[in-house]
Amino acid sequence: LLSKGVAESLARGVEVLEQAGAKVLAGGKPSTAAGFRHTNTLLRATAKQFIAAPHVLQTECFGNASLAVVCEDVAELLCVLKSLEGNLTGCVYSDTAGSDDATYDKIVPALRERVGRLLNDKMPTGVAVSAAMNHGGPFPATGHPGFTAVGIPTAIDRFAMWACYDNVRETRLPDALKNKNPTGKLWRSIDGEWTQK
């Protein structure tokens, strides 16, 4: 793990999930190995447990821990999905022959609005740095759901501070916003038109 604090936070998170009724199927404890380590952990909860305490059973466990929520049917799964907080990713595994297309069509709309990146038949471990990639999501997955940690050029936007200057005199504006382009090369949108003037 990244640090002692992250390792301690993961251990506390797993403990919270256990106290909320999740059953540890594997791991569950900090590792005795040197460094900031935790045993690979898998916990299980029923959909009924999750729906009864969604906030607690969504306690963040940043690291090598997963909670499997077991649903009896699609209706129960939809209730679980509707109680999800924002997440970076959501994965749906389906039959490539299409035998479960009707179920997929019910699940995806409920999941889509709760994740920044929807995957089908794929684990979310690989994140390509490309214009089409998003590694953000609705709060609390990210602090600002409009931006992503990867992806070109939008990843840089998360470091930007948005500001509006309204009725500010020309002499008080930053150079890039003055009527005269400071370099003659800077692209600017003026009255809805992109120009280098």
Segments and roles (model prediction):
Residues 13, 53, 107, 159, ...:
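Generic structural signal of hydrophobic/aromatic residues within well-ordered alpha-helices
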Residues 1-92, 102:
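NAD(P)-dependent aldehyde/semialdehyde dehydrogenase
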Residues 173-197:
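Extended hydrophobic packing segments that form well-structured cores
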Residues 56, 137-138, 182:
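Generic signal for short, ordered secondary-structure residues
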Residues 44-50, 141-144, 189-192:
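Short, structured secondary-structure boundary patches
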Residues 33-36, 74-173, 194-196:
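C-terminal core of ALDH-fold dehydrogenases
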